Regions:
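...captures the hydrophobic TM-helix bundle architecture rather than a specific catalytic motif
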Residues: 1-174
């Protein structure tokens, strides 16, 4: 945070933004490129996106009970029910770890990658790729507990809603 605030006071900071691109899909006379562009505005957004992603990861570790034992009756696709442990001769139920803990964090990590791609994109093609990655991950995260009918219905609703927006976005790009 200190570095960010100090960087705001530096003169000529945004005169040389970082930009790079690579040819991705050559089609005849046209070459589609994928690239990145980090200017002062993009750097500020990256800063806040990074803080947000860190907070999401930190919250998720506690929410999914990392470090707790596996539950006796937990099943993949459903929220954890709790684990029975014996301490000092007494049995009691404690929160149990999410059965698909690593899968959840893979989805969150991919969502973060899509968000970073969206922020640093230097053209509409790269922006669209980042947007689609985020849309896919939104569907996967909303329907993470797929054993619950309400989670499945919400995931499908979110998927269809974002696909409608994607069609119009793609038409606007074309």
């Amino acid at each position: 945070m200190i570095v960010f605030v100090r960087a705001l006071g530096v003169e000529h900071l945004g005169e040389q933004p970082f930009a790079d691109s690579i040819p991705w899909l050559p089609t005849g006379d046209t070459v589609f490129e994928i690239g990145v562009l980090v200017d002062p505005t993009g750097a500020a957004v990256l800063f806040f996106v990074s803080i947000t992603i860190f907070m999401i990861f930190l919250y998720s570790v506690g929410y999914h009970n990392f470090g707790q034992p596996a539950g006796d009756h937990d099943r993949a696709g459903l929220p954890p029910h709790g684990a029975t442990v014996e301490e000092h001769g007494h049995k009691h139920v404690v929160p149990s770890v999410e059965p698909m803990y690593s899968r959840f964090f893979a989805f969150i990590g991919l969502f973060a990658f899509g968000m970073y791609t969206l922020v640093v994109s230097d053209n509409l093609l790269t922006l669209y790729v980042g947007w689609e990655i985020m849309g896919l991950c939104s569907y996967l995260l909303i329907g993470f507990w797929y054993g619950k009918p309400s989670a499945r219905a919400a995931a499908i609703k979110a998927f269809l809603t974002t696909r409608l927006g994607d069609v119009f976005m793609l038409l606007g790009i074309a």
